[in-house]
């Protein structure tokens, strides 16, 4: 584990321990609504404080971009951390174990390091550009399925901005008719890690934020998968529209999506 990932993991583990304690008494967790179906809790905020303080101490010249508190550090910094202190807040608040801490490091705008930590399972996904992806120190690879009708596809519903719900449901209906099934588990970082391990053969979602997808996308890429936007291009981090899959089914997924967008 290189120094960047070591620092990230130590901070994520501390934040994860705090989450596990909080999960034992959810009635005491204070929650606010940022928008319709978009919640934030004091657990999100406390996790972010732990992560930001650790990164600032280790790397005072790095920029840090967070879901809850925005940007820290110089805008022109060569290194930038993108972190989601609690991906899957709604899951967490309902006692569902599918939530994670997501941390990615960019150098001059290029993803270099990624860590996704799932506290309930104590699962640590990580990747370094050009060096592969790991789950709990074991190398992971995307699936090798070819036929779409044998593939399991992950996705996420557009519950915050529902303006494109009809279009999304048309896409989902098409996928459900042509695949082995779909899953909506509520934490994009872990959905992407599921692609990286082969548990999902593909994943798609619209209108996500950089902290939702930056770390998971690099983990998919380093596990042998491909990540694109809905047009098959490389603009997914900017647009928030993402498709991730093993190389053998990506084109089939894009064909279905393109018929509706």
UniProtKB/Swiss-Prot annotation:
Molecular function, one GO term: inositol monophosphate 1-phosphatase activity
Residues binding substrate, per UniProt: 67, 86-89, 183, 212
Any matching Pfam family: Inositol_P
EC number: 3.1.3.25
Gene3D superfamilies cross-referenced by the UniProt entry: 3.40.190.80, Fructose-1,6-Bisphosphatase, subunit A, domain 1
UniProt xrefs under CDD domains: IMPase
Annotated keywords: Chaperone, Cytoplasm, Hydrolase, Magnesium, Metal-binding, Ribosome biogenesis, RNA-binding, Transcription, Transcription antitermination, Transcription regulation
SUPFAM superfamilies tied to this protein: Carbohydrate phosphatase
Major enzyme class: hydrolase
Predominant localisation class: cytoplasm
Reaction equation(s) it catalyzes: a myo-inositol phosphate + H2O = myo-inositol + phosphate
Binding site for Mg(2+): 67, 84, 86
Annotated localization: Cytoplasm
GO CC terms, sorted: cytoplasm
GO biological process terms, semicolon-separated: inositol metabolic process; phosphatidylinositol phosphate biosynthetic process; ribosome biogenesis; signal transduction; transcription antitermination
Cofactor(s) the record lists: Mg(2+)
Record InterPro entries: IMPase, Inositol_monoP_metal-BS, Inositol_monophosphatase-like, Inositol_monophosphatase_CS, Inositol_monophosphatase_SuhB
Transcription regulation recorded as keyword: yes
Family: Belongs to the inositol monophosphatase superfamily.
Subunit relationships: Homodimer. The rRNA transcription and antitermination complex (rrnTAC) consists of RNA polymerase (RNAP), NusA, NusB, NusE (rpsJ), NusG, SubB, ribosomal protein S4, DNA and precursor rRNA; S4 is more flexible than other subunits.
Function: Might be part of the processive rRNA transcription and antitermination complex (rrnTAC). The complex forms an RNA-chaperone ring around the RNA exit tunnel of RNA polymerase (RNAP). It supports rapid transcription and antitermination of rRNA operons, cotranscriptional rRNA folding, and annealing of distal rRNA regions to allow correct ribosome biogenesis. This subunit may play a central role in organizing the structure.
Name the record gives this protein: Putative Nus factor SuhB
Organism, scientific name: Neisseria meningitidis serogroup B (strain ATCC BAA-335 / MC58)
Lineage of origin: Bacteria, Pseudomonadati, Pseudomonadota, Betaproteobacteria, Neisseriales
Gene (name only): suhB
């Amino acid at each position: 584990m290189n120094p960047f990932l070591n620092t990230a993991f130590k901070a994520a583990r501390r934040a994860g321990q705090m989450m596990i304690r909080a999960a034992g008494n959810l009635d005491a967790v204070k929650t606010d609504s940022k928008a319709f179906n978009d919640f934030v809790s004091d657990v999100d905020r406390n996790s972010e404080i732990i992560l930001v303080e650790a990164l600032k101490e280790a790397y005072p010249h790095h920029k840090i971009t967070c879901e809850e508190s925005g940007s820290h550090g110089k805008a022109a910094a060569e290194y930038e951390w993108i972190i989601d202190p609690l991906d899957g807040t709604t899951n967490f608040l309902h006692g569902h174990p599918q939530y994670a801490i997501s941390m990615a490091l960019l150098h001059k705008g290029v993803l270099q390091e990624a860590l996704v930590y799932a506290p309930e399972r104590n699962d640590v996904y990580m990747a370094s550009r050009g060096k592969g992806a790991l789950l709990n120190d074991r190398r992971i690879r995307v699936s090798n399925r070819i036929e779409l009708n044998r593939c399991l596809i992950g996705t996420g519903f557009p519950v915050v901005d529902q303006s494109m719900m009809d279009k999304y449901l048309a896409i989902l209906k098409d996928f459900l008719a042509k695949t082995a099934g779909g899953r909506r588990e509520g934490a994009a970082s872990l959905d992407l890690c599921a692609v990286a391990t082969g548990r999902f053969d593909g994943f798609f979602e619209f209108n996500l934020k950089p902290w939702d997808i930056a770390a998971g996308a690099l983990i998919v890429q380093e596990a042998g998968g491909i990540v694109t936007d809905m047009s098959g291009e490389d603009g997914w981090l900017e647009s928030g529209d993402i498709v991730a899959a093993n190389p053998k089914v990506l084109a089939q997924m894009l064909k279905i999506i393109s018929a509706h967008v």
